[in-house]
Amino acid sequence: MAGVVEQKSGLVRDKLGEASKRNGLINTRSLVAESRDGLVSVYPAPQYQSCRVVGSVASAGPDGARNEPLQQLLDPSTLQQSVESRYRPNLILYSESVLRPWGDGVAADCCETTFIEDRSPTKESLEYPDGKFIDLSPEDIKIHTLSYDVEEEEEFQELESDYSSDTESEDNFLVMPPRDHLGLSVFSMLCCFWPLGIAAFYLSHETNKAVAKGDFHQASTSSRRALFLAVLSITIGTGIYVGVAVALIAYLSKSNHL
């Protein structure tokens, strides 16, 4: 019965040893480091010299079963050396004693940026890193502003508005039909020099006919001629009336002297 129990315990230990070998560098059960030559103790201390295992040492028991290697505790000081032997050559592990002077030497070439919140300067003063304050008068404070001349833009807007108004007036003039000046023609025909008045009246009718046909060019030409003849008729008629009045006054004055 005891042999069966020892055999089962041996099988369990074998399984645990295989699992620990797959797990990596450290055998958590037997507490030995795995190397190419076998299992080597990781403790250099004198008190553990008797517990070192140089190889896969196994002793036969009374029942013929193999005994597992002796268990040892882990020495943390040798962990780094064991890990370094397993890493690639391009990965180098340095101790803190080596990194500290290196960091002190490089610190002079580095620049550190610190962000501080809610540290706005007081009114009319600025805070410097050494804790000193400097007072600034309103004359010393310079505010950089950017300005540009807007006169050219205003002139451009005025020219654009003038051009647009002229264009609209020209468009309205072209769209509006020419005037026939019929009333002025009738007045020149009845009250002024009637031959020119009759011609102006005739041209005013021609203007209406051209507008009805849609010939605005002919209508505008007839309208200008009618206006010219009507004004000329009024001018001549006014001159005739003034001449007749002067002649009548002169005749009456001569008759009174007689």
From Swiss-Prot:
Extracellular side: 203-228, 250-258
Residues modified to Phosphoserine: 137
Subcellular location: Cell membrane; Early endosome membrane; Postsynaptic density membrane; Synapse
Keyword Membrane assigned: yes
Any matching Pfam family: CD225
Molecular-function GO terms, alphabetical: glutamate receptor binding; protein homodimerization activity
Primary site of residence: membrane
TM ranges: 182-202
KW RNA-binding (keyword) present: no
Intramembrane region list: 229-249
PANTHER family linked to this entry: SYNAPSE DIFFERENTIATION-INDUCING GENE PROTEIN 1, UPF0338 PROTEIN
Similarity field: Belongs to the CD225/Dispanin family.
Descriptive protein name: Synapse differentiation-inducing gene protein 1
Source species of the chain: Bos taurus (Bovine)
Lineage: Eukaryota, Metazoa, Chordata, Craniata, Vertebrata
Gene: SYNDIG1
